[in-house]
Amino acid sequence: MTDYFLLFVGTVLVNNFVLVKFLGLCPFMGVSKKLETAIGMGFATTFVMTLASVCSWLVNTFILLPLDLIYLRTLSFILVIAVVVQFTELVVRKTSPTLYRLLGIFLPLITTNCAVLGVALLNINQSHDFLQSAIYGFGAAAGFSLVMVLFAAIRERLAVADVPAPFKGSSIGLITAGLMSLAFMGFSGLVKF
């Protein structure tokens, strides 16, 4: 049980997908201008990453490995992710039309989010079992959501702050992301792998 907790904490804080592995930077910068949009995108991405991680593990274990089709791994994972994203889009459209409108084009773009494909491929490369895959996918998504919500809150405050003209917009956003990455480096001694 401790191993699962350490895997979760290590994935959320120590090996954060955005700030350490630099995966998922497009939605991180694109959706983080408003806090409510970042929260909605975080929930959608959490659902997709967790489900895609589990489904990819199942496809790899029960289809690709027995049939010796490992060379189709990336292509099949992309297909699995696309199906999961379409399912998520249908669920969000039916349950929360306001969130669906807020997310706009970013919801279908979760399909091309490299963090989602990254979590599926890293699960296989690290030889996780089913439960570890689910925890790793959920931890990666929770870390992604945490960083995106924190960054959105900071960006909302920076929008009304007195920032020098050359640093307004993306410049101060990248500086802030760099400082957040340095702050998360403080967690590096928390979990030993």
UniProtKB/Swiss-Prot annotation:
<keyword id="KW-0472">Membrane</keyword>
<dbReference type="GO" id="GO:0005886">
    <property type="term" value="C:plasma membrane"/>
</dbReference>
<dbReference type="InterPro" id="IPR003667">
    <property type="entry name" value="NqrDE/RnfAE"/>
</dbReference>
<feature type="transmembrane region" description="Helical">
    <location>
        <begin position="171"/>
        <end position="191"/>
    </location>
</feature>
<comment type="subunit">
    <text>The complex is composed of six subunits: RnfA, RnfB, RnfC, RnfD, RnfE and RnfG.</text>
</comment>
<keyword id="KW-0813">Transport</keyword>
<protein>
    <recommendedName>
        <fullName>Ion-translocating oxidoreductase complex subunit A</fullName>
        <ecNumber>7.-.-.-</ecNumber>
    </recommendedName>
</protein>
<keyword id="KW-1003">Cell membrane</keyword>
<dbReference type="InterPro" id="IPR011293">
    <property type="entry name" value="Ion_transpt_RnfA/RsxA"/>
</dbReference>
<keyword id="KW-0249">Electron transport</keyword>
<feature type="transmembrane region" description="Helical">
    <location>
        <begin position="62"/>
        <end position="82"/>
    </location>
</feature>
<comment type="similarity">
    <text>Belongs to the NqrDE/RnfAE family.</text>
</comment>
<dbReference type="GO" id="GO:0022900">
    <property type="term" value="P:electron transport chain"/>
</dbReference>
<comment type="function">
    <text>Part of a membrane-bound complex that couples electron transfer with translocation of ions across the membrane.</text>
</comment>
<dbReference type="Pfam" id="PF02508">
    <property type="entry name" value="Rnf-Nqr"/>
</dbReference>
<feature type="transmembrane region" description="Helical">
    <location>
        <begin position="134"/>
        <end position="154"/>
    </location>
</feature>
<dbReference type="InterPro" id="IPR050133">
    <property type="entry name" value="NqrDE/RnfAE_oxidrdctase"/>
</dbReference>
<keyword id="KW-1133">Transmembrane helix</keyword>
<feature type="transmembrane region" description="Helical">
    <location>
        <begin position="39"/>
        <end position="59"/>
    </location>
</feature>
<keyword id="KW-1278">Translocase</keyword>
<keyword id="KW-0997">Cell inner membrane</keyword>
<feature type="transmembrane region" description="Helical">
    <location>
        <begin position="5"/>
        <end position="25"/>
    </location>
</feature>
<feature type="transmembrane region" description="Helical">
    <location>
        <begin position="102"/>
        <end position="122"/>
    </location>
</feature>
<keyword id="KW-0812">Transmembrane</keyword>
